Amino acid sequence: MIDDDGYRPNVGIVICNRQGQVMWARRYGQHSWQFPQGGINPGESPEQAMYRELFEEVGLRKKDVRVLASTRNWLRYKLPKRLVRWDTKPVCIGQKQKWFLLQLMCNESDINMQSSGTPEFDGWRWVSYWYPVRQVVSFKRDVYRRVMKEFISPVILLQESVAARVATPPSPRRKRG
């Protein structure tokens, strides 16, 4: 499904842990790393596509995550000319993406890169929040920067709430007498 401007509707997924680190996934058989992402099927909402892609690419279900935020607007990037398939109609010149920030609520061991018949990724790791902006392929860098700027506040709030829970000692128990 390509829009009138030549962009394929797509969702991007940033998964964070309670420490504010983000999941960084290695593309299958490549030395290229990125966030999970994928196309939106006809009749599917961005949120439905996000949950489908979440399972297909990393084996997680709705119960395994909590949605912290989504981008206000669609974000676009153009593909380099060498990656455009000029022989397909309509021609796709890039992606327009709706991004979601998710908090991992399950155990890391529940992550399964092999959940679909054709895996997108063959490995993953936790990285610092801003690391992906510097490391992603150059034509996606501006979108990643915008996504991470938009999502920083919910991540800071998450880190602060975790720190507050750790720093707050339990209330003393009263003696019954």
From Swiss-Prot:
Gene Ontology CC entries for this record: cytoplasm
Record-listed E.C. numbers: 3.6.1.-
InterPro entries xref list: Nudix_hydrolase (IPR020476), NUDIX_hydrolase-like_dom_sf (IPR015797), NUDIX_hydrolase_CS (IPR020084), NUDIX_hydrolase_dom (IPR000086), RppH (IPR022927)
Pfam families: NUDIX
Record domain Nudix hydrolase: where: 6-149
Cofactor: a divalent metal cation
Placement of sequence motif Nudix box: 38-59
CDD domains, per database record: NUDIX_Ap4A_hydrolase_plant_like
Family listed: Belongs to the Nudix hydrolase family. RppH subfamily.
Cited PANTHER family: M7GPPPN-MRNA HYDROLASE
Name used for this protein in its record: RNA pyrophosphohydrolase
Organism: Pectobacterium atrosepticum (strain SCRI 1043 / ATCC BAA-672)
